[in-house]
Structures are given as C-alpha cells and as structure tokens.
Amino acid sequence: MTNEESATPKISVLMTCYNAASTIEESVRSVIAQTFTNWELVLVDDLSDDDSMDLIEKLGDTRIKIKKLPTRHRRTKALNQGFRLCLGEYIAVLDADDIAHPTRFEKQVRLLDTEPSLVGVGTWFTNIDEHGRELSRCEFSSGPTAIKRSLASNSRLVHSSMMYRRESAEVFHGYDEKFDYAQDFALWLSLSRLGELSVIPEQLTKLRRLTDSMTLGKDYSMSMVSDGYVLYRRAQGLEGLRVIDRLKGMRTIGLYGLLYAWRSLRAGNVVRAIGLVITNFWAIPLAVIELLRKSLKSFNSVK
C-alpha cells in the first residue's frame, strides 16, 4: 500500500495561527509539497482578524482541517485544541511562518517506523528573515545521547522541526498548559521518560525569525524566563546525565534565575525578585562573565 492509499492519515501536521497572512500560505504549501503525502493538516486559528484562513481555504486541499476558535486561547491551549483533533500515528509540527523541506516528513516517518525506541525526531534547521533570506544554520550533535545531554542545559530541539508519536504524547495529555512559552520543551522532557529523542542531521526546516512574531512579543518575555527556569530545574532529574551535564544545567538554571529576578523586579514583584536572587546568588559571577562575553562579541561584530 502506498502512502496515498491509506484512509487514515499516517501523519497529523499540527499548526496554530494568529494573524499570519504574510507567511502562512508559504508554510502550508511546503506541507502540500511533501514527498510523503498521507497526511492531514490540523490548522487551529486562534481568532485571527486578518485573511489568513481565506488564503488557506482557497488552496482547496481536502486534507486541510481548519478549527476556528471562538475566543482567543493563546499558544499552548490552541496547540492542545489541535492535538485533540489529530488522527495520525505521528504528529508533525510546523508553525505558520516556517517552511518544511519537501522530504522532511518522508525521512522522519522512515526513522520512527524503523526505530521503535524513538518517541520523537527533529531536524537541523536554518534561520531565515521575513523575506526568506538565510540568517544562520544550526547544526549540532544529533544522536539520542547527545540530545538528552543537551536537554539539561541548552535544548536544541525546535518545535517546528519535530515529529513525535501521538500515543506517547497522549500519556501526558498533550502540551502542559502551565507553560505559555516553553510548552514544547516541557513535552520533550516528558517524552524522554518514555523513550529516546533524536535529530536527523540534515537541513530540513526553515525557521522564520520575525520581530513581531507572537512568541517574541512582550507578553511572552516573562513566560520565557519563568518557563526556562522551571523546566531546566526539572531537567536535572533526567536519567543518564553525566556530572558535567548537570553542572552545565546548574549554570543555565542560575542564569535563568537571575534573569527571572530582573524581569520580576521590573514587573513590580519585589518579593519574588529577592527570593530568586537569594536562591541564585552564586550565579552572579557567571552572569557578569556572560554579559562581558556578549558585549565583546557585539563589539567584534561591528569592528
């Protein structure tokens, strides 16, 4: 049986959208262009007030299922609305401003089909600007051991590049709604308790870096640091980490803790800020070094 002949989709592509008219058509067309064709696209519109959905409806592809939310849900709840509609054995994620290489799904399905120990697989990725121009490429050690070690201090798994087993994610009821920003990282930590995570060492995903992207907005700045602080502390409980992995993780926790304290102070939460500084006081020298390193890098870039 070819992948076109199955009545039930092998893959559910999960995409959420909020006012993405400038990018969503290109993203959806990259799904339509996949060499693996047995998929459904579950597209959750989080109360957009532009013509995003009109653009997609005009494509006329019956594999696209649009769920229009009656009220604004924000990112994590919108993802779960879509997650509950997914029928595929595997769920592939693609944001409404990102692009999948034509062979991405085919290669991820092949790996998950042949490696039952894997619960999820991502890809290397290229960062692009709003016009599609390449900004940088991200390539890194990609085997299960390297990925688990990176989860402790510097997760390299990008949500929009991932494909994971739906049944495995259902154990945790999808995405943890306590996390507004890093709901994907929370899921990877949960899935790692059930099996291995890996990455295909090929450039199969393009991530669009937009200055007005939802996850870069001011509303998410506090969630970004609070989620990171909580989740990297949780990552210390991963099995199989080396001492060096845990030490790197503690460094990350300390830096996130101080940044969380600063953001809390600016938001007027003095009590929380003081508590975070006391807890992470030991990381202040690390923060100073990090600031100096970034300043030197910035200085060298303009020389």
Go through each PLM region and give its residues.
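Conserved nucleotide-sugar donor-binding catalytic segment
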Residues: 84, 101, 123, 137, ...
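Glycine-rich, basic loop-to-helix element that forms the pyrophosphate-binding segment
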Residues: 69-86, 107
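Short aromatic/hydrophobic "clamp" motif used to bind/position activated sugar donors
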Residues: 91
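A conserved acidic beta->alpha catalytic loop
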Residues: 30, 37, 45-54, 71, ...
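N-proximal low-complexity "stem/linker" segments adjacent to membrane-targeting elements
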Residues: 1-32
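Conserved donor NDP-sugar-binding/catalytic core segment of glycosyltransferases
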Residues: 103-135
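C-terminal subregions of glycosyltransferases and related glycan-biosynthesis enzymes
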Residues: 2-5, 185-186, 209-303
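Acidic helix N-cap motif at the loop->helix transition within catalytic regions
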Residues: 22-25, 50-58, 99, 103
